[in-house]
Curated annotation (Swiss-Prot):
Gene name of the encoded protein: mnmG
Subunit structure: Homodimer. Heterotetramer of two MnmE and two MnmG subunits.
Organism: Ligilactobacillus salivarius (strain UCC118) (Lactobacillus salivarius)
Keywords: Cytoplasm, FAD, Flavoprotein, NAD, tRNA processing
Function: NAD-binding protein involved in the addition of a carboxymethylaminomethyl (cmnm) group at the wobble position (U34) of certain tRNAs, forming tRNA-cmnm(5)s(2)U34.
Binding site for FAD: G18, A19, G20, H21, A22, G23
Cofactor(s) it depends on: FAD
PANTHER family linked to this entry: GLUCOSE INHIBITED DIVISION PROTEIN A (PTHR11806), PROTEIN MTO1 HOMOLOG, MITOCHONDRIAL (PTHR11806:SF0)
UniProt-listed Pfam families: GIDA, GIDA_C_1st, SAM_GIDA_C
Compartment(s) of residence: Cytoplasm
Binding site for NAD(+): 281-295
Protein name from the UniProt record: tRNA uridine 5-carboxymethylaminomethyl modification enzyme MnmG
Superkingdom of this protein's organism: Bacteria
Keyword Flavoprotein: yes
SMART domains: GIDA_assoc_3
Amino acid sequence: MEFGKRYKAKDYDVIVVGAGHAGCEAALASARMGNETLLITINLEMVAFMPCNPSIGGPAKGIVVREIDAMGGEMGRNIDKTYVQMRMLNTGKGPAVRALRAQADKRQYSIEMKHTIEQTPHLTLRQGIVDDLIIEDGEVKGVVTNTGACYGAKSVVLTTGTAARGKIIIGELMYSSGPNNTQPALELSKNLAKLGFELKRFKTGTPPRVDGNTIDYDKTEEQPGDVEPNHFSYESKDEDYLKVKDQLSCWLTYTNEYTHKIIQDNLDRAPMFTGVIEGVGPRYCPSIEDKIVRFSDKPRHQLFLEPEGRNTDEYYVQGLSTSLPEEVQQEMVRSIDGLEHAEMMRPGYAIEYDVVSPYQLRPTLETKLIKGLYTAGQTNGTSGYEEAAGQGFIAGVNAGRRAKGLEEITLKRSDAYIGVMIDDLVTKGTNEPYRLLTSRAEYRLILRHDNADLRLTELGHEIGLISDERYAAFEEKKAQIEAEKQRLSKIRIKPNAEVNAFVEAHGDRELKDGVLATEFLRRPYVTYQDLLKFIPAPAEPLDRRVIEQIEIQFKYEGYIKKEYAKVEKLKRMEAKKIPARIDYSRIEGIATEAQQKLAKIQPETLAQAGRISGVNPADLSILAVYIEQGKIARVDD
């Protein structure tokens, strides 16, 4: 491959490589902190593009978007401006697993994010392909593009996503490509490997898109948006929420035995099973051919037909991800109820790409090998726009703080789902595309959709990404919550006829004695609005989000206190720092497997060491004694 002659270009504080969901958050965070930031990407028409599902949020992921917003990130604001449908999921379950999901106008989402980037001070957007890094004495000093431009920087964030040596596969067809048939980045991976980084090969996939004009909607089940307003951003207003009639519906259908037979008959042409695909695919988002083989007892699989936007007829067939040959895909699509006459506008495909094994990162997302070099998003082995954006935000903040000579930030597992994800990646690594799930969080009752601001907005203000005006509104919300909680704790409800009729209607026993309003509200069937039927209302009406906090904090108080007690115990473990450059082989009594894992991952705290697979409690106890007694054996320089 021919390269341009190298020449000295401009210097920046921070350079972000790749303008996907991770790169956009990283660049905006850095620039908003006052760093001169360059965001360089292969194609300016693909900024924050959605090459896979046209949606944001869902279980765990939706909470990540709220966390990004609570700290001053952009994804929540952007989807609130460009959604075509909004739904709160798991409303019949407890608050720990409720999650917001928005159907996006994918083109408008990209346009809006690009506009935001272009209007942000200190942020320069450029088209280009980064082929190499400038490294001096183990520290990154800039990047080199394929045209030869050498840009200097104090920190660099790599968010190359599936473009890193990307290869698209459709049946027997294979070709080098980034997502959605964009140009791939071929040289950067080679140069990262030369620097000593361990790279892995992962795979993801996408389903066919069909022409909405050729769908028979009468044979599907409509999935409309919510009537009640909800938003990803704490800054969005209820009056701006789209009425249901202005939202676009999704449509539910299913595969059937005929669909499964078509797939079974063509498994000999499926790259998943012929050995063509080398990369490891996502466990929690398998291709349809993988589902048919793994779950052969299931007679059908759920599919959602999702609109890709207001100004396109393309529908995304969620649940039908595939890399089967194009003609097989068309036959498969037409076997499905409602899609008998559907015209495919784009075939599904698999894409292989390079990832940096994430155990090579610190919890700040800086690489251990090269100072000042950060990685985020699918580059680190995750799947999903939200996971990428969460990492991008943290990497951008830390790259920006490093450029200013400030201490970097880390999020603990008890702080945020973003903290859970990063800790999982750097402590355990991943052998497949990592997806955030509520089950990965041991403190999920305190890591809720509704309280992301209470957990993280103070941090966002400290790092300079939450304005004083927004912070004052946040402080006012907190004050209102506490004032109303105090008011309710002093009011007693008397056992009159009206109250007893209400409790008996809900199958409860009548009151014999008076009860505090707070205790009454703790009953599962009592809402705050029910409570106001029996007690005076507050002097000023309360916002629904304040009321939501009051209800949750009272109803789940006992469980929440138990989780916070666990968090305090964890904090004591996190406070026990492990000195750098330990020779674990010289610590007597630690099992060989544990020595090898500890040496490879180099945990920074005793708590992190305890989460490494292969390190058992006995190993941890010995390590703790060595740390406390100062017996640590360091590696000689």
